[in-house]
């Protein structure tokens, strides 16, 4: 093959590729549902600057639908695309056409552009949809309707970036399935897909042969990757006409109709579309008859087609006009239709219709009647009456009754715009239910006006035929009387091309004008036959007189009748003619409207029917309108009546009035009943005895005068007779935040219906804010404070427990809850007693009574702020009887809340909640008192039975205790309980890890007077034990250990005696009394023994507490001092869990009269820990295993403090002038990795020896040593051994109570125990 032939072949192949001529038959569609103008456009996401995806044919055919659909628009007829990116210049932002681009990035007429041309830009330039035209894929679908049969050539003048076009069913989309997902066909009519790294050629075309009148599916898919977007679309019709861009009238949209049969037309060439055939035939009737006939025609393809033939039959003879006008004596125009039968010249009977119009002979108003009524709107009703015409046929007449309100109101005529071409007036009937519950029909006249100017009922439409067609369409409108009315709409269809008129005028020899319609068939330019209508008007060649005859007669009205005569025309044929005979009365007559007075309160208009016999002997029905007016002036139908209720009642009553014609008429009367006295609306206020305002809603039923019940609502507000707070309640509570809760209460109103009321309770903390205490009055004689627990469900649906503190105060004078009592103690004691009172709500409430016991003797104290020393003097000291425990007993002590203050406003407080359990009969646990303090205080029993227990013994159960020394500013309060738990702080003798001990020796210089303490030997004696229960007392004799101790302070000697029963066996009655005279004060002590009971012991370690039940001996003792009797109760547990002990050797140094001796003795080491405010205290006790009774006298003189430390064996030497105590500890114990200083004396605790305790404080470091008891040290839990520092804030309260401890340390073993515990509490 030569090169020339090869090039020729290549050109042919290229031409065939660019020009895709569809030679095969293209499938068409005939959708049956309603069509819409334009095409649908769907938008899909496309990645910016993606230059490969749109090169894939599968993506352009259907793959785009898998991307994100951005939205869609419809009704698009201008389907070409021309998008220009914006150019941002110094003069503004303007779109820049691609052909105006120059240079690096400039636009002609605009200048240099500063923006980036290859980024995404948003706009509505593509069919009004807001998207990024720079990067998007869109799909256009619709049906192409060819106006001609032949070849249609579609063309893309250029493509930027990629596009395809498909035409035909099964190529673009299936028939009647436009909205379905795209099909997978890649048989494109135009393939404008941009090749990889290339550009598609310009002027790409595709040709499709289509048949006129069929719809062809068409789809266009376009993609743009960046910047400008261009796709100009055009089509060339078979006649050579080119349509570009705007495809108005060629593209349509149909909704999916997948169930439509025969939607697809595979071969339109074999499918015949038939037109309607109109045929005109002459006939012998006197009017034009139009009928529709259905025929089946077999087309050239052998397929039968249904055709519709309209047959118009026109009369062959002349006839007179069928409309007749007659005068009559009524007040309105009546139109009736009469049917007559005429025998034509051909002997065939023909039915003719004569329209008779009867007009009134006198001037009158129309049939519209206006009546006043008492409603608030205008009511228009239509009344139907039947009038029998002169021909004996009944005719329906309509009377419109307009009832206008006596007050201004809007009309009932509504005007609405609509999209049709004519004005429509319809009457709509609505039913309104009045206050009496009866429905009333109302008429609303709705006038719908076209949004564009148009003529009345004549509609003009364009069509593709060559002549003007006028057809009459009959519609039925249902009036307000419920009867259908036929309306006629004349539709004029005009050809879209110019044509000559079809009206022809011909002369003829008859006496009237004849108009007939003739059908001719004209073959159009498309080769199809078209039926045309020619209207032939035949006019008479000679003049003729009319057929109307007027005759006088003797009646009172004008009668018009039609008479039929037969006239032989000039053609020798008989013609039926109609003569209208008008008979007029010879005398004047009045109108038919009659006015009559009557006794009612309104104007009544009724229609009466009378029958009049005319001159022709035929009866004629006449209508007389009777207007009855009231004889006296009256208001409208609204009636006002007074009544005795407190509100205005409006009811609607329905009455029936029978008119003079005997027909009942429904009338509505509105009755307004007003109260005879002034009152507020429906709100009623009533007093009641509660403490809050209640608002309830009550429903009452009022029966109106018409006997119908009416529901009315009365709001009843009940206000308290006494002042009360609102529904917002403020209460204090012990938490740290303000709580607001909503409580729902249900109040049952007088109607028995419960009403929910809401009380807002605001609980505020008692500190740092307003106190929100709620005070309520009650009939009790004291103030009651109760704590109520409520559960409030929050907005998150979770329940929250809230505490409400309610303080109820007595409404009358009652006993004060604070009681003051004298006692023989040396300080003021405040105790709290708990009583249970059942409140008005039936719930028990704990009430607290504070009892203040004041000392009968004065105590003076002095504070030196420079040295921190406190000197306390008691002007009169008395022995205090302190019952001790049996040798095998144990003690359980719980103490809490210790506070102290001095006169210089220096407040030191600590909270302690502890439980101490030890197997030793004496608890060797202490805070060591300073030797510089000289004081004498009395000690009270640590244990007292109470729900919450008390350190201070009283004759009643107590809760809490406070102490204050009247001569100083120091005070302390504590609370203890036999069965008490607290996770905060515990004293426990349970097993402890080893605690490292060190020895400290120091000398304290003091200028205060020395304190001398003497401890005597104990002896056993018999005592009389008085046991009381339920106010019945018995006496018994029991063995007891008697211990005595004396303390001399500044020359004042105090002796302490303790009786401790050692047996609970009851014996013969015997009383042991001890009387001691000291400075004129007499004290008498009696100790009794009660039966054995069971107590609960709480043991706590590492914040874990457990309870055990143990039998205990209950011992009571009474002391009478200056006539004041105090009862002391002691519980001595018989057994308990023994703590882990260690046995070691200690060196006991005994000194007397300046001579000291040392002995070595085994000792039991007991340890206990206490946690107070996260400070861990370890207590160790060395108990020498010897029973030697010792008497120790210690004196404190001024000396120099000296401390030595021995790493081998801890040794502490305390020099006090004449007396010196040396203690050596050979064991080391450690706990919690904290170093603690422990010193132990060689004093035999069991032997109840005691010595002076010393306290030293320097800066913030505190070292405590004891020569007679165990020692301890304090540090926070987290303090390392190298930085253990005591709290300086404890110095004042330690020194305050050290004096009391010093005095007790010189006494008996129990006094030593009490002093140790007192110091430990500090």
From Swiss-Prot:
Name of protein: Flocculation protein FLO9
Function text: Cell wall protein that participates directly in adhesive cell-cell interactions during yeast flocculation, a reversible, asexual and Ca(2+)-dependent process in which cells adhere to form aggregates (flocs) consisting of thousands of cells. The lectin-like protein sticks out of the cell wall of flocculent cells and selectively binds mannose residues in the cell walls of adjacent cells.
Species assigned in the record: Saccharomyces cerevisiae (strain ATCC 204508 / S288c) (Baker's yeast)
Any one of the GO BP annotations: flocculation
Region (3 X 51 AA approximate repeats, Thr-rich): 1013-1186
Sequence repeat residue intervals: 278-322, 323-367, 368-412, 413-457, 458-502, 503-547, 548-592, 593-637, 638-682, 683-727, 728-772, 773-817, 818-862, 892-906, 907-921, 922-936, 1013-1063, 1085-1135, 1136-1186
Domain notes: The number of the intragenic tandem repeats varies between different S.cerevisiae strains. There is a linear correlation between protein size and the extend of adhesion: the more repeats, the stronger the adhesion properties and the greater the fraction of flocculating cells. The Ser/Thr-rich repeats are also important for proper cell wall targeting of the protein.
Polar residues compositional bias, start-end: 1002-1018, 1186-1196, 1257-1284
PTM annotation, UniProt: The GPI-anchor is attached to the protein in the endoplasmic reticulum and serves to target the protein to the cell surface. There, the glucosamine-inositol phospholipid moiety is cleaved off and the GPI-modified mannoprotein is covalently attached via its lipidless GPI glycan remnant to the 1,6-beta-glucan of the outer cell wall layer.
Chain segments carrying region Disordered: 770-799, 816-843, 950-1018, 1186-1221, 1256-1284
Domain PA14, chain residue ranges per copy: 74-249
Database matches in InterPro entries: Flocculin, Flocculin_t3_rpt, PA14/GLEYA, PA14_dom
């Amino acid at each position: 093959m030569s090169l020339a032939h090869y090039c020729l072949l290549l050109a042919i192949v290229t031409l065939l590729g660019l020009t895709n001529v569809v030679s095969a038959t293209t499938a068409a569609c005939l959708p049956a549902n309603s069509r819409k103008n334009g095409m649908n456009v769907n938008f899909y996401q496309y990645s910016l600057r993606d230059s490969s995806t749109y090169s894939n044919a599968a993506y352009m055919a259907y793959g785009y639908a898998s991307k994100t659909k951005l939205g869609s628009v419809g009704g698009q007829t201008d389907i070409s695309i021309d998008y220009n990116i914006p150019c941002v210049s110094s003069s503004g932002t303007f779109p820049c056409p691609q052909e105006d681009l120059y240079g690096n990035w400039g636009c002609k007429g605009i200048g240099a552009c500063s923006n980036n041309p290859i980024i995404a830009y948003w706009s509505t330039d593509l069919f009004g949809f807001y998207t990024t035209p720079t990067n998007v894929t869109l799909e256009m679908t619709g049906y192409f309707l060819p106006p001609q049969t032949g070849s249609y050539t579609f063309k893309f003048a250029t493509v930027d970036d990629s596009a395809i076009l498909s035409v035909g069913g099964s190529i673009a989309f299936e028939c009647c399935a436009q909205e379905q997902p795209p099909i997978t066909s890649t048989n494109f009519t135009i393939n404008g897909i941009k090749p990889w790294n290339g550009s598609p050629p310009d002027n790409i075309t595709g040709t499709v042969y289509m048949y006129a009148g069929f719809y062809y599916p068409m789809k266009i898919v376009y993609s743009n990757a960046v910047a400008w977007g261009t796709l100009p679309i055009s089509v060339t019709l078979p006649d050579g006409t080119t349509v570009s861009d705007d495809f108005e009238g060629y593209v349509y949209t149909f909704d999916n109709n997948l169930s439509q049969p025969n939607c697809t037309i595979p071969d339109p060439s074999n499918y015949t579309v038939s037109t309607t055939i109109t045929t005109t035939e002459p006939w012998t009737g006197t009017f034009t008859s139009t009928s529709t006939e259905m025929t089946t025609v077999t087309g050239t393809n052998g397929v039968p087609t249904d055709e519709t033939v309209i047959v118009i039959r026109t009369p062959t003879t002349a006839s007179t006009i069928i409309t007749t006008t007659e005068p009559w004596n009524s007040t309105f125009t009546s139109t009736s239709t009469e049917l007559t039968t005429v025998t034509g010249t051909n002997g065939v009977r023909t039915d003719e219709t004569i329209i008779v119009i009867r007009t009134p002979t006198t001037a009158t108003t129309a049939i519209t009647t206006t009546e006043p009524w008492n409603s608030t709107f205008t009511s228009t009703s239509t009344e139907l009456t039947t009038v029998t015409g002169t021909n004996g046929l009944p005719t329906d007449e309509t009377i419109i009754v307009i009832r206008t309100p006596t007050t201004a109101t809007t009309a009932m005529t509504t005007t609405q715009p609509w999209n049709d071409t004519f004005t429509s007036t319809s009457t709509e009937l609505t039913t309104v239910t009045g206050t009496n519950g009866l429905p009333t029909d109302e008429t609303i006249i709705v006038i719908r006006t076209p949004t564009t100017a148009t003529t009345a009922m004549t509609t003009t439409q364009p069509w593709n035929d060559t002549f003007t067609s006028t057809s009459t369409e009959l519609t039925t409108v249902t009036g307000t009387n419920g009867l259908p009315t036929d309306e006629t709409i004349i539709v004029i269809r005009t050809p879209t091309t110019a044509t000559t008129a079809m009206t022809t005028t011909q002369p003829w020899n008859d006496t009237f004008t004849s108009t007939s319609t003739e059908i001719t068939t004209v073959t159009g330019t498309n080769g199809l036959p078209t039926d045309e209508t020619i209207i032939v008007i035949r006019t008479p060649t000679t003049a003729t007189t009319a057929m109307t005859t007027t005759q006088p007669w003797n009646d009172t009205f004008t009668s018009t009748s039609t008479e039929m005569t037969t006239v032989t025309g000039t053609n020798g044929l008989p013609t039926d003619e109609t003569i209208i005979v008008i008979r007029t009365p010879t005398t004047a007559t009045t109108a038919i409207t009659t006015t009559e007075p009557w006794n009612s309160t309104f104007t009544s208009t009724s229609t009466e029917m009378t029958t009049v016999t005319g001159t022709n002997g035929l009866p004629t029905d006449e209508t007389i309108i009777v207007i009855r007016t009231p004889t006296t002036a009256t208001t409208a139908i609204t009636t006002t009546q007074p009544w005795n209720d407190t509100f205005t009642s409006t009811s609607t009553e329905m009455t029936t009035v029978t008119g003079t014609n005997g027909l009942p008429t429904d009338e509505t009367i509105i009755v307004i009943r007003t109260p005879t006295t002034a009152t507020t609306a429906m709100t009623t206020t009533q007093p009641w005895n509660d403490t809050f305002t209640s608002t309830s809603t009550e429903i009452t039923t009022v029966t109106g005068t018409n006997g119908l019940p009416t529901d009315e609502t009365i709001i009843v507000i009940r206000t308290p007779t006494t002042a009360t707070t609102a529904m917002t309640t403020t209460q204090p509570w012990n938490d740290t935040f303000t709580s607001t809760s909503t409580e729902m209460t249900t109040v049952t109103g007088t109607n028995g219906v419960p009403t929910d009321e809401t009380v807002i309770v605001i609980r505020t903390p008692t500190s740092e804010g307003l106190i929100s205490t709620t005070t309520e009055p009650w009939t009790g004689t004291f103030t009651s404070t109760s704590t109520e627990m409520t559960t409030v469900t929050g907005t998150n649906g979770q329940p929250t427990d809230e505490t409400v503190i309610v303080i109820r105060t007595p409404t009358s004078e009652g006993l004060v809850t604070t009681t003051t009592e004298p006692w023989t103690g040396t300080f003021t004691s405040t105790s709290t007693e708990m009583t249970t009172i059942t409140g008005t709500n039936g719930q028990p409430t704990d009430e607290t009574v504070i009892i203040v016991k004041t000392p009968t003797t004065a105590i003076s104290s002095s504070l030196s702020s420079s040295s921190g020393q406190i000197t306390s003097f008691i002007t009169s000291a008395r022995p205090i009887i302190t019952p001790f425990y049996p040798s095998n007993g144990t003690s359980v002590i719980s103490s809490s809340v210790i506070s102290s203050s001095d006169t210089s406003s220096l407040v030191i407080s600590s909270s302690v909640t502890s439980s101490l359990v030890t197997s030793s009969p004496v608890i060797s646990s202490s805070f060591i008192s300073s030797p510089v303090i000289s004081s004498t205080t009395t000690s009270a029993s640590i244990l007292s039975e109470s729900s919450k227990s008390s350190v201070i013994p009283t004759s009643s159960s107590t809760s809490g205790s406070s102490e204050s020394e009247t001569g100083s500013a120091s005070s302390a309060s504590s609370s203890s309980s036999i069965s008490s738990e607290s996770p905060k702080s515990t004293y426990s003798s349970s097993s402890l890890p080893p605690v490292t001990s060190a020895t400290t020796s120091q000398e304290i210089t003091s200028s205060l007077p020395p304190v001398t303490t003497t401890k005597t030997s104990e002896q056993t004696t018999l005592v009389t034990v008085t046991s009381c229960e339920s106010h019945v007392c018995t006496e018994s004799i029991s063995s007891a250990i008697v211990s005595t101790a004396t303390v001399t302070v500044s020359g004042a000697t105090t002796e302490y005696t303790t009786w401790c029963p050692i047996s609970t066996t009851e014996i013969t009655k015997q009383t042991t009394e001890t009387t001691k005279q000291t400075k004129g004060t007499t004290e008498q002590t009696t100790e009794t023994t009660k039966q054995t009971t069971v107590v609960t012991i709480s043991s706590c370690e590492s914040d874990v507490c457990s309870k055990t039940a143990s039998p205990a001996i209950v011992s009571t003792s009474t002391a009478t001092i200056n006539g004041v009797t105090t009862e002391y109760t002691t519980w001595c547990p018989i057994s308990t869990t023994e703590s882990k002990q260690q046995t070691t050797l200690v060196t006991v140094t005994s000194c007397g009269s300046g001579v000291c001796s040392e002995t070595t003795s085994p000792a039991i080491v007991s340890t206990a820990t206490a946690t107070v405010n996260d400070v861990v205290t370890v207590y160790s006790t060395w108990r020498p295993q010897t029973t030697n009774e010792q008497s120790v006298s210690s004196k404190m003189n001024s000396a120099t403090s000296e401390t030595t430390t021995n790493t081998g064996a801890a040794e502490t030497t305390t020099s006090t002038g004449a007396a010196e105590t040396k203690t050596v500890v050979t064991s080391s114990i450690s706990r919690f990795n904290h170093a603690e200083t422990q010193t132990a004396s060689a004093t035999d605790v069991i032997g109840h020896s005691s010595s002076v305790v010393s306290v030293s404080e320097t800066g913030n470091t505190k070292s405590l040593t004891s020569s007679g008891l165990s020692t301890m040290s304090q540090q926070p839990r987290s303090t390392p051994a190298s930085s253990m520092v005591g709290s300086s804030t404890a110095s004042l309260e330690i020194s305050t109570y050290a004096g009391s401890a010093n005095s007790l340390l010189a006494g008996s073993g129990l006094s030593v125990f009490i002093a140790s515990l007192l110091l430990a509490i500090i």
